[in-house]
Amino acid sequence: MSGATLEAYLASCTARGDDLSRDVAAVIQRLAKAALDIRKLVNQGALGTAFNGTHGGSNTDGDLQKDLDILCDDQFLTCLQGAPVACYASEELENPVLLDPSARLAVAIDPLDGSSNIDNNVSIGTIFSVLPAAKGPDVDPSQSFLQPGNRQLAAGFFIYGPQTALVLSLGKGTEIFIFSSRLGCFVEAYKSAIIPERAHEFAINMSNYRHWEEAIRLYVDDCLAGSEGPRERDFNMRWIASLVAETYRILIRGGIFLYPADGRKGYSQGRLRLVYEANPIAFIIENAGGAATTSIDRILDLVPENLHQRVPLVFGSRREVARITRYHVDPNMIGERAPLFGKRGLFRA
């Protein structure tokens, strides 16, 4: 059932707001316009000139940059020229770009999340965070991004899949808009999305089981044990390897997503980036009634140490996220498990 257009929704949200809220709305509309251009590039697939080319360099994550990654980054950076944005930070750039020092907003973005999966026609997307810009004489632009996620003014992601969608939170609920080809704009499809408290699905990359810490193994063992185990109900496992696709599914159907720290080289602090991946996703999830943590600590309370800091990420149905925290901090949680599901679990480490 369709609702307001994105433009009408933003107008209603800012009708009684201040200049800052109107600036946020202006930025979101510019991002939406750029996303529709990127949608066209993505939809060309292997027929597009940017699809198979590689840039020759690596991004801050060490991933080989595709031409499409660079094009998308340039597209968003260009669309924010002249917008009320002081500085722009991206996964594809080592340092923030200064735009308008007098502006009041900062934008952090993962321009094409999941681009390594594009050859497989998996849904990919753009994740963004809008923050108040740091102010002061000779302020370093990076300071705008070294503030906790609970200070975000807005966050969202575009997903380029069977439908092109925008998931958006301005801090009071989470809305889902679908692009209407007939109308040529985003239209509200799910108003005030609410994540079900009870989860029946979990998403994790099981191939890394042997590298996880014990609490994560035990949680997964208990889910896999199903109705015969301590959870006394069956679970399904999902793994798309696309953060935006996993998040979208959880918003619609509930469940939990886990990308924990593990014992592999480079993964001890987690893998996802706090500023432009974990923070915006956590903001969206919490405003839909869910929770997001590092397994222990609330994501939105973390103060970033640097722009590209990595963190573990667990999010989804509130009860399941809280349960994982208890597996980490409450020894009695392990002691209460049935003998069959003791520390060895269903798998040998």
Swiss-Prot record:
**Biological or metabolic pathway of the protein:** Carbohydrate biosynthesis; gluconeogenesis
The record's remark on the cofactor is: Binds 2 magnesium ions per subunit.
User: Which GO BP terms sit in this record?
Assistant: fructose 1,6-bisphosphate metabolic process; fructose 6-phosphate metabolic process; fructose metabolic process; gluconeogenesis; sucrose biosynthetic process
Recorded catalytic reaction(s): these are:
beta-D-fructose 1,6-bisphosphate + H2O = beta-D-fructose 6-phosphate + phosphate
| UniProt cross-references to Pfam families, sorted A to Z | FBPase, FBPase_C
One Gene Ontology cellular component annotation held by this UniProt entry = cytosol
Family of this protein = Belongs to the FBPase class 1 family.
Q: How does it assemble?
A: Homotetramer.
UniProt protein name: Fructose-1,6-bisphosphatase class 1
What organism does the UniProt record list as the source? Rhizobium meliloti (strain 1021)
